[in-house]
Amino acid sequence: MSDNFAAVGIALVVAIAINLIMMLMPKLLAPKKPVPEKLTPYEGGNQTIGRTWLGFKSNYFLYALVFTAFDVETVFLFPWALSFRQLGTFAFIEMFVFIVILLVGFWYAWKEGALEWM
């Protein structure tokens, strides 16, 4: 049994080492000759007009969060629907409670205005 853990440990160490090597190689091998032209933001070859760094609206984050919640619901709902007949009444009640919890969350997000575009 300890052989299995040793194999997992070795695989973990190798995976971490490969990631570290891949992250450090560009820093070690890339040329380091910063010139003012390279440090300017690129906008299709045109000079920038106004501020280059603009704020990011948090509404997009809220949309992504709500989308992720309902996407996860779909991931859980699909296998349940495929094996609905074998699972019985308990699984139906469990999935009903799951959907009710998600609908309450959706209602709360709607009530708080998280789903308004602007």
From Swiss-Prot:
Main EC class the enzyme belongs to: translocase
Catalytic activity: a quinone + NADH + 5 H(+)(in) = a quinol + NAD(+) + 4 H(+)(out)
Gene3D superfamilies linked to this entry: NADH:ubiquinone/plastoquinone oxidoreductase, chain 3
Domain of life per record: Bacteria
Major site of localization recorded for this protein: membrane
Topology in the lipid bilayer: Multi-pass membrane protein
InterPro entries according to UniProt: NAD(P)H_OxRDtase_bac/plastid, NADH_UbQ/plastoQ_OxRdtase_su3, NDAH_ubi_oxred_su3_sf
A GO cellular component entry from the record: plasma membrane
Family matches, as Pfam families: Oxidored_q4
EC number: 7.1.1.-
Transmembrane segments: 5-25, 61-81, 90-110
Sorted UniProt keywords: Cell membrane, Membrane, NAD, Quinone, Translocase, Transmembrane, Transmembrane helix, Transport
Intracellular or extracellular location(s): Cell membrane
Key word Acetylation present: no
Presence of keyword Manganese: no
Record note on quaternary structure: NDH-1 is composed of 14 different subunits. Subunits NuoA, H, J, K, L, M, N constitute the membrane sector of the complex.
Sequence similarity: Belongs to the complex I subunit 3 family.
Function (record text): NDH-1 shuttles electrons from NADH, via FMN and iron-sulfur (Fe-S) centers, to quinones in the respiratory chain. The immediate electron acceptor for the enzyme in this species is believed to be a menaquinone. Couples the redox reaction to proton translocation (for every two electrons transferred, four hydrogen ions are translocated across the cytoplasmic membrane), and thus conserves the redox energy in a proton gradient.
Protein name, per record: NADH-quinone oxidoreductase subunit A
Organism: Desulfitobacterium hafniense (strain Y51)
